[in-house]
């Protein structure tokens, strides 16, 4: 039986093949991305630099002598590599379990291609089992929570966590996310919301799944 970490590593190592040399790339956050950074560092593949979405990813990139640059220093990114908490057959995702989804959306939007890497347990027919992270301004937390409650969700403050931008995270359980694009937009319209963890406008272009049979490359709506 292959462990979850081994499945993540399988996907991460396959993703290195999708990284073009002599280009700037974007790097996400999370345990699967840690395996990807390790694989990229050991591959010998040369890139100009990487824009990191978190301090932890940046530190790991530096360990492998991969140049870390800011998004303001580059005109665009060839590819963005990141994991997901859930990903559906249209390659729309829920992300932000690590609280970095605002930065992740910014970097993803600057990239020509989004490669999602995950173990096979993250591939679902319908989003919503994983709680949806919503980054909120602290002073609007109660207001936003009431609005989310009215939308059918069960909001819960992520205790003791502050985002990179000094905001709070409300994790929303039980939302009906049959229409991810609509839900993403509706939540972002709530005053006091900075960003939510539905990636429908910035869906992945390619999904690389780590499975018992090896790495599986999936494109939108292939099933």
From Swiss-Prot:
Pfam families reported for this sequence: Rib_5-P_isom_A
The protein's role, per its UniProt record: Catalyzes the reversible conversion of ribose-5-phosphate to ribulose 5-phosphate.
Species in which this protein is naturally found: Neisseria meningitidis serogroup B (strain ATCC BAA-335 / MC58)
Family to which this protein belongs: Belongs to the ribose 5-phosphate isomerase family.
GO molecular function: ribose-5-phosphate isomerase activity
Gene behind this protein: rpiA
Name the UniProt record assigns to this protein: Ribose-5-phosphate isomerase A
Any GO CC annotation of this UniProt entry: cytosol
Root EC class: isomerase
Keyword Repeat applies: no
Biological processes per GO annotation: D-ribose metabolic process; pentose-phosphate shunt, non-oxidative branch
PANTHER family tied to this protein: RIBOSE-5-PHOSPHATE ISOMERASE
């Amino acid at each position: 039986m292959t462990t979850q970490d081994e499945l993540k590593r399988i996907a991460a190592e396959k993703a290195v093949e999708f990284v073009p040399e002599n280009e700037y790339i974007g790097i996400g956050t999370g345990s699967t991305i840690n395996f990807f950074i390790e694989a990229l560092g050991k591959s010998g593949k040369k890139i100009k630099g990487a824009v990191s979405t978190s301090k932890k990813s940046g530190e790991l990139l530096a360990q492998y002598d991969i140049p870390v640059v800011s998004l303001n220093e580059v005109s665009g990114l060839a590819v963005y590599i990141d994991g997901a908490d859930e990903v559906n057959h249209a390659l729309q995702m829920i992300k932000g379990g690590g609280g970095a989804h605002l930065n992740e959306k910014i970097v993803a939007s600057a990239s020509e291609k989004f490669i999602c890497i995950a173990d096979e347990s993250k591939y679902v027919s319908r989003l919503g089992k994983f709680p949806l992270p919503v980054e909120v301004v602290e002073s609007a937390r109660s207001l936003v929570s009431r609005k989310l409650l009215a939308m059918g969700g069960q909001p819960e403050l992520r205790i003791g966590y502050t985002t990179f931008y000094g905001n709070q995270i409300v994790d929303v359980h039980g939302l009906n996310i049959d229409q991810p694009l609509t839900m993403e937009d509706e939540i972002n319209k709530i005053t006091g919301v900075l960003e939510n963890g539905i990636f429908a406008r910035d869906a992945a272009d390619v999904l690389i799944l780590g499975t018992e049979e090896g790495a599986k490359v999936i494109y939108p709506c292939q099933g």
